[in-house]
Amino acid sequence: MSLDNTKLLDFLGEIDKELKRKIIIVAVGGTAMTLLSVKSSTIDVDFTIPSEYYDDFEKAKKIIQPGFRVDVFHDGAVFTTMLPDDYLKKSKLVKTKLKNISLHTLHPVDIVITKIGRLDSRDEQDIEYCIKKFKLKENHIKKRAEDIGYARNDQVFIDNLQSVLKKFFPEK
């Protein structure tokens, strides 16, 4: 199932109705790219949520049963990548009419960093879209990459990073 901005916000509107208090959620990956209008839709829904709001979101999600996959990570973790503590401060606020959800997206450089960790062909395409749309510079990606934690083999991340930099920032 393909989810565009409207479907994502409809889903979050249903979650919003079930919440008993205000929470913060941060869209990652294709979800963030859809909300930032980099992509027209996403095939899955992914968030990283500060721990104090994680259970609230999960309870609401269980009640509404969205009918599509929703992956939720804790505190700046995104798949096998652990973003620095400032990921939330660097995130971008998405203006919505939601009452109990403060919706953010990862900063575009953090989207790129998390996609480098997995780096399949779709991730490469997403990285290219982010670099072009947000005019990301090689040094910004390198610097941010130095700050992250990686749950698999660090060498895999380093190799993926080098591959991305070589592909999208060829030496002049």
Which residues does each PLM region occupy?
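Compositionally biased terminal segments of proteins
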Residues: 1-172
